[in-house]
Every structure is written in structure tokens, then in C-alpha cells.
Amino acid sequence: MAMAERPRPGWASYQNPNINNCQDMGNSILLLLGLIVCINIGINLVTLLWSRIRILLHRMFHIICEKETSTSLGKLVQPLRKQTYPKVHLRCTMDPVKMTVTPPPTRRRYRHRAPPSRRARCPIAWAPDTDDEKPPHQHPAICSRHWNDSKDWEGFQSMQEVWEPWTQDGLEQPPQTIRFQPAVEARPLKSEIRSDQGLEAYVYTVNPPPPSPEALSHKNNAAGSGGCVEGEQAQGQPVSPSFLGPANVPEIPRRHSSGRIVYDARDVRRRLRELTQEVEALSHCYPLVSGSSAAEGTGKDWVYRPLKGR
């Protein structure tokens, strides 16, 4: 019985390692559960305190960035102080003259042009031409811009016969600052004036030079032999003294003033009216002789023909 009660040493050695393994497995499981609990608690704390943690992190990064920028600027200022260059200020300006002022041809393109009949009646503002070195052939006798219509020229031809004796002997220019050009092909004596602004005008002489006897004899010979009887009647009349009066200057219509007028238009119109009144007052001094009577050669230096009947 004593032998049966003794434990066997093999069984004891066999049971001891199993108990130790079980204890180790339980301890490891407890450790894992503890770690899981700790992680869960940490996550809960972070979620609860995230707003405050975010503010703290923002302040920390802001302070760190300011320190870095201050140190970088301090390093850049030192080499700039060693090499100092003068400051350059660039100022862009625009020339107002080039923006506003345009040449006269460009203005004429956008301006409403009147019909040729109206443009022929209106006078053009002009300035005296002081450039005497230019040859006279550069300026045409008739302005194509103002005499486009045939009707205007027909109305203007009424003055031709009055100026015919003077156009043939009009080579001598009167002592004036304005350059005059003689007529071509029995056209009225006139001159074309061009100002600096591109304006054009025609000026007629009031007292042109008297015609030479040769010009009158040439005209009398060309008149023909159709008016011999009238020439004899004209010879019986007393010969008036060779007095050269002012020419009949046509009335210039009123024109709207513009910024380009260089002279006083009212003064010019007033002088022209005085000249016309003087011509009417002295009209009785001029004998009314027809064109056929001049063919006989009465010895007169001039022939006056009124324009009222034309």
C-alpha cells in the first residue's frame, strides 16, 4: 500500500510544463487586451482634444516659420548693404500733341462735304503766301476742287470780257505780298494762294495794270469788220480822259466762321462793298461801247462793259 501511495516522478515531470504554458498564454492574452484598451483610450482622448491640439500646432509652426524668414532676410540684407545701387524710377508719359493734332487731309475725310455749287460760292479762308522762291507753275490757274461743276464756271465766265483787255498785258505783277498769276487762254486774272494749313483761295486784283496799245490793237484787228457803222458813230462821241477806275468786284457771300480764318472777313466784305459803290458812282464816266466799235480803233486804252444785262 505504501508503494501505491507514492507518486510517480514521471507524471510529475509531465504535468509541470503544461501548467506553465497555460499560464504564459493567459498572461499574453491579458497583455493584448490591456494594449487594446490603452489604444482605445488614447484615440478617444485625441478626438476630444483635437481642436485644442490643432491651435497649438498652428502657433508652433507659425513661430518656427517667422524665425526662418527673419534669418533668411538678415542674410540677404548683408550683401545688399555691401553693393548699394541708385534707385531708378521709370515714368511713362504720353505726348498729348501727337494724340490730338492731325493733319488737315485727315480732317477732310471725315467732314461732310457740300455740293460743288455751294462750295464754289463760299470763300475759303487764306493766309498770305510768303514763300516767293516757289515757281509759279506749281499752282494751277483753276482749282479743280472748287470748279468741278460746269454751271459754276458758266456763271463765273460773266467776268471774262471785263478782264480781257488786262489779261493780255498782265505780266507785270503788282507790288503786293500775294503772288498773282496771269490768265491763260483769256481767263480772268487771278492767283491761287496756299496757306500752311492746306487752304486755297483766289484773289482778284482791284486795279490791275493798264493794257498796252499793242494788246488793244491786236484785239481790235481780231474783232472783224462787222461793226463799221457803229464804230463811226462811236468816233463822233467825245473821248473821255484815260482814267483807270476800280474794277467791279463781285459780292462775296457770308460764310460761317471757322477756327482757321487768319484775316478779318467783315473788314474784307466792307471794303468790297465800298469798291462796288464806287464803281456804281463812277459808271457814268465809262462810255458804253459795243464790241464791234472797238474794231475801228478809237484810241481808247480800255473798254467798260456792265454786267447787269448779262
Swiss-Prot record:
Tree of life domain: Eukaryota
Swiss-Prot/TrEMBL GO biological process terms: flagellated sperm motility; sperm individualization; spermatogenesis
Alphabetical list of InterPro entries matching this protein: SPEM1_N (IPR031368)
Pfam families for this protein: Spem1
Tissues and organs where the protein is expressed, per its UniProt entry: Testis-specific. Exclusively present in cytoplasm of steps 14-16 elongated spermatids (at protein level).
Free-text disruption phenotype from the record: Mice are completely infertile because of deformed sperm characterized by a bent head wrapped around by the neck and the middle piece of the tail. Lack of Spem1 causes failure of the cytoplasm to become loose and detach from the head and the neck region of the developing spermatozoa.
Segments passing through the bilayer: 29-49
Tagged with keyword Membrane: yes
Keywords: Coiled coil, Cytoplasm, Developmental protein, Differentiation, Membrane, Spermatogenesis, Transmembrane, Transmembrane helix
Parts forming coiled coils: 262-286
Gene Ontology CC annotations of this record: cytoplasm; membrane
Signal peptide segment: none
Membrane topology of this protein: Single-pass membrane protein
Residue numbers spanned by region Disordered: 215-238
Localization per record: Membrane; Cytoplasm
Function (record text): Required for proper cytoplasm removal during spermatogenesis.
Protein's name in the database: Spermatid maturation protein 1
Gene, per the UniProt record: Spem1
